[in-house]
Swiss-Prot record:
Protein name: Large ribosomal subunit protein bL35
This protein's UniProt keywords: Ribonucleoprotein, Ribosomal protein
Any GO BP: translation
Cellular component terms per the entry's GO annotation: cytosolic large ribosomal subunit
Gene Ontology terms for molecular function: structural constituent of ribosome
Protein source organism: Pectobacterium atrosepticum (strain SCRI 1043 / ATCC BAA-672) (Erwinia carotovora subsp. atroseptica)
The gene coding this protein: rpmI
UniProt similarity note: Belongs to the bacterial ribosomal protein bL35 family.
Length: 65
């Protein structure tokens, strides 16, 4: 049986944690930052976790993670 291919875009976006979850970066912190408040930008800075509803999709994209 052939190997399952990893979705390369997902491999670059998600990192697996020791507990089995996946870390991800928050959106809306790339450009057009002048109109966003400092508080909003600060809260977007730390890594987020993939929600339970999306976890199955991420696991399917990363079969060897």
């Amino acid at each position: 049986m052939p190997k399952i291919k990893t979705v390369r875009g997902a491999a670059k976006r998600f990192k697996k944690t020791a507990g089995g979850g996946f870390k991800r970066k928050h959106a809306n912190l790339r450009h057009i930052l002048t109109k966003k408040s400092t508080k909003r930008k600060r809260h977007l800075r730390p890594k987020g976790m993939v929600s339970k509803g999306d976890l199955g999709l991420v696991i399917a994209c990363l079969p060897y993670a």
